[in-house]
Amino acid sequence: MKDLTLIIPAKNEAESLPKVLKELNSFSVKKIIIIDKHDKETSRSIQNFYCLVVKQKKNGYGSAIIEGIQRAKTKYVCIFNADGSFDPKYLKKMYLKLNNNNHFVFASRYLKDGGSHDDTLLTFVGNKIFTLLGKILFKLNLSDILFTYIMGNRNYFNKLKLKSNDFRLCVEIPVKIQRKKFKYTSIPSIERLRLGGKKKVNEFLDGFLILYSFFRYYLIKND
């Protein structure tokens, strides 16, 4: 996987990120880009690791992903969490799927052999509803639309012209992939418990924004 860059947004992840980077030492990726929102504690915690730390310019999870992709140079990029919930053992399988004529590969907690140790009833039900909406409104062939463990061809990521600066990015990515008729597939994965820190998602506020974005993309075809 010498042509793969991992994009890791990191906000208040000093407890978990060093453990994540230590685990990633066992995997042969070309580069790891940490998008740091001026968090001195997190930056200090990873100063002995080989990675590129980029200071985030705009606020939000989506902005961190977009800025990370813009800094990448490799053929492939993968969105990866700083909290330890994404298991890197799936990277190789996703990479092989990309090399089998796919432009994007989504990890899914809800395919057979997938699962989650971090889901709550609220996030489970919400994800099922949003995934169903994706199928109905956009004919998306996905089982886990809110899980952003996504690997893709960098040139095709750039063609999406992503704009969302928050968690609405998890809807924008698959909707634009579908509209542009890019090839994508999914693999089962198990979401682990986070290694430290706190969740950044506000289930109610972010859920409302995601719902709004569904209907916005449905009504505005060229956005």
Predicted regions located by residue number:
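Donor nucleotide-sugar binding loop of glycosyltransferases
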Residues: 13-16, 61, 87
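Acceptor/aglycone-binding surface of glycosyltransferases and processive sugar-polymer synthases
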Residues: 57-59, 63-71, 76-79, 89-167, ...
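Short beta-strand/loop segment that forms part of the nucleotide-sugar
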Residues: 21, 29-38, 54-55
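Short, well-formed alpha-helical segments that are part of the catalytic scaffolds
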Residues: 12-26
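Acidic helix N-cap motif at the loop->helix transition within catalytic regions
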Residues: 15-19, 40-48
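Cell-envelope/extracellular polymer assembly enzymes that use nucleotide-activated donors
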Residues: 3-5, 172
